[in-house]
C-alpha cells in the first residue's frame, strides 16, 4: 500500500518491468500535475505527473476509485503527452 492506495499485481509488475521508482508513484498520487476524474469508460481516475528525473516524461497512474482502498491498476510513462 502506498499513500493509502492499494497496488494491483499488474501495477507492481509494471513498476519493476519499467523501472518506475516508488517515490515517483508517491509524488504522482499525492501531488499530481493533472488529475482527470472519470477519464475512461470504466470511471477510473488518471493522475499525471511530469518526472524531471526521467527526462521530463509524464507518468500516468490509473486508479480505480470505486473500491476501498482505491486501487492503482496500471502505471506507465505516457508518450502521448509532451
Briefly describe each language-model feature range.
Residues 1-82:
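Ribonuclease/tRNase effector modules and their secretory precursors
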Amino acid at each position: 500500500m502506498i499513500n493509502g492506495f492499494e497496488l494491483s499485481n499488474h501495477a507492481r509488475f509494471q513498476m519493476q518491468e519499467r523501472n518506475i521508482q516508488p517515490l515517483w508513484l508517491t509524488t504522482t498520487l499525492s501531488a499530481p500535475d493533472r488529475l482527470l476524474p472519470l477519464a475512461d469508460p470504466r470511471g477510473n481516475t488518471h493522475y499525471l505527473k511530469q518526472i524531471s528525473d526521467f527526462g521530463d516524461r509524464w507518468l500516468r497512474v490509473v486508479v480505480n476509485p470505486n473500491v476501498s482502498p482505491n486501487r492503482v491498476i496500471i502505471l506507465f510513462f505516457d508518450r502521448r503527452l509532451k
